[in-house]
Amino acid sequence: MSRRLGAAAAVLLLWLAVLTFAFHGYYGGRLGSARRRNILLQHPALALHLPTRKMLLAVASFDDASSPSSLTTTDRHHHHHRHHGHHHHRGHDRWNRKGVPPTAAGPGEEVDPRFGVQKRLVPTGPNPLHH
């Protein structure tokens, strides 16, 4: 039983080493882009042996974008950010999240329009805990 456990642990460590090597590259991510470019210009065959995270992410995002199930969520996500700030946040000064209109409060008794509760006075100035 202990021999099987030792073999399983060795296989697990081997897979972790392979995955770490695959994700961090041959030089451990310490090879700068200018230095990498110079090496690749001198030895173009090394381009296949020096995978970068950007290349891996580009391949993964290309594969995800080509699947039909991800097209609708990707389009919806981009649409939201394209119009972000134009008309989505117009009514925050009139209504809060719960749909309750703000009341007419006097000075010092302001109601937060987002949450519909009384605003608390927050002290400003230097932090007394920092000397």
From Swiss-Prot:
Where does this polypeptide localize? Secreted
Annotated signal sequence is: 1-22
What segments bear the compositional bias annotation Basic residues? 76-97
Cellular component terms (Gene Ontology):
extracellular region
GO terms for biological process?
cell differentiation
Its annotated function is as follows: Involved in the maintenance of the floral meristem and of the shoot apical meristem in the vegetative phase. Suppresses the fon2 mutation and acts independently of FON1. In Oryza sativa subsp. japonica, the protein has a single amino acid substitution at the putative processing site of the signal peptide and is inactive.
**Family membership:** Belongs to the CLV3/ESR signal peptide family.
Name the UniProt record assigns to this protein: Protein FON2 SPARE1
Native organism: Oryza sativa subsp. indica
